């Protein structure tokens, strides 16, 4: 049973953290503190120093961190806390919104408290983050890169088709078409190389 919950609202540049004491939750949530930290390793270290000051009589192992999935902005923090042996629950922002109702406007302080209170109410459903292996990370990076290459190739092919269909013949159009075809071939080569890297994992 966790004794302290720290709800974290994460953006690209910063993390807003609200801590609550849930040992006597039947008497109401005891709000401990709220702080803002940079979303980078120095900010993570400062957050843990802050947390240690708050939780006298409680170890960090008895603290649960909870954040919304944010499309990547939360990953570094989750990896950092996981490496420290601490528990962080990454929950779907949609799930939190469903449970807590609509929030009017964007208030990072209020959002971090909402996340903490959500984690308290649904503590029995918590699924703690496990950092993926290096192979999984590499695979995700390569698949993402391959998708971007494919999108770029498709875009260039569409542009070539449009030029052929609409543009009058001229030296400049001929150059653009030749150069675009050259770029498409280069992209196809990169896609094949990327696929080799994927198969080699």
Role assignments for model-derived ranges:
Residues 1-23, 115, 149:
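Gly/Thr-rich phosphate-binding beta-strand-loop-beta motif of the actin/hexokinase/Hsp70
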Residues 12-42:
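Short glycine-rich, Thr/Ser-proximal phosphate-binding strand/loop in the N-terminal lobe
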Residues 19-21, 77-79, 161:
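Short amphipathic alpha-helical segments
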Residues 41-64:
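Short, basic/hydrophobic alpha-helical segments
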Residues 63-76:
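Acidic, metal-coordinating catalytic cores used for nucleic-acid/nucleotide bond scission
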Residues 74-84:
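Short Gly/Thr/Asp-enriched flexible loops that form oxyanion-binding sites at enzyme active sites
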Residues 82, 89-201:
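Long, charge-rich intrinsically disordered scaffolds of nucleic-acid metabolism proteins
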